[in-house]
Amino acid sequence: KSNGVEIRTRALVEKVIVEGGSAKGVRLAGGEEIRSFIVASNADPKRTFKTMFQSEELDEDTLKRTDSWKTTAGCVKFLAAMNELPDLTQYLGSNYDANSIINIKIMPSVEYHVQSWRDAASGKVSSCPVMNIQIPSTVEPNLVKGKGHVMSNWVLFEPPTLKNSTWEAERKNVGEQIIDVISQYAPNFRNSLVDWTVQT
């Protein structure tokens, strides 16, 4: 707030307000309008352009590209609170600065990446989860009270809908799988966890 920012949670955007060919704000599901010089969406392009705009507000090329965009695979998000950083000494040696590790990518081979995609495309939980891990508390310690760290992990590729199960049924198993994979690279990871959740 001291920087002039207000973050609202559970504020569903119903429509982008367009005036004179430019986005001028958003209308929330409850009817409230928020005006702004800049409108940015963190929703995927299909959801943004197909549900938040009227078709006549967009040019034909944008509509065609949005319609042709394939969205047959997705991801899950793994969030964790840890009492210490992942120990990567087996890969980086004993002299590395743990606080300098902001991003970690787990994708050991092209074949691993391809298998992750194939699993998702066939509606299965990925047997080879590709991970994009961020530990923002290494550069912004105010994200946690006292000691400890937080992790945000985008896990690719996972199908939006599972073929023979549901995400509700698989959420805990997927979380355990993610913990096991990270622990192959950082053996202290499981014991460092204070809490974790998986979002689908």
Q: Which residue stretches match the model-derived regions?
A:
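Conserved redox-cofactor binding core of oxidoreductases
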Residues: 1
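Mid-domain catalytic core of redox enzymes
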Residues: 5, 14-144
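General small-molecule cofactor/ligand-binding pocket signal
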Residues: 6-8, 194
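Flavin (primarily FAD) cofactor-binding/catalytic cores of flavoenzymes
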Residues: 11
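FAD-dependent oxidoreductase catalytic-site/capping-region signature
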Residues: 129-200
